[in-house]
UniProtKB/Swiss-Prot annotation:
Enzyme class: transferase
EC number(s) given by UniProt: 2.8.4.1
Region (Disordered) location: 1-20
Keyword Cell cycle annotated: no
Recorded catalytic activity of this chain's protein: coenzyme B + methyl-coenzyme M = methane + coenzyme M-coenzyme B heterodisulfide
Subunit (UniProt): MCR from M.thermophila is a heterotrimer composed of an alpha, a beta, and a gamma subunit.
Subcellular location: Cytoplasm
Names of required cofactors: coenzyme F430
Official protein name in the record: Methyl-coenzyme M reductase subunit gamma
Protein keywords: Cytoplasm, Methanogenesis, Transferase
């Protein structure tokens, strides 16, 4: 999730919360 936080469209809702 951390490396994908720059690509919100590729993250799930849960990962998006972790990334941001």
């Amino acid at each position: 999730a951390y490396e994908r936080q720059f690509y919100p469209g590729a993250t799930s809702v849960a990962e998006n919360n972790i990334g941001h």
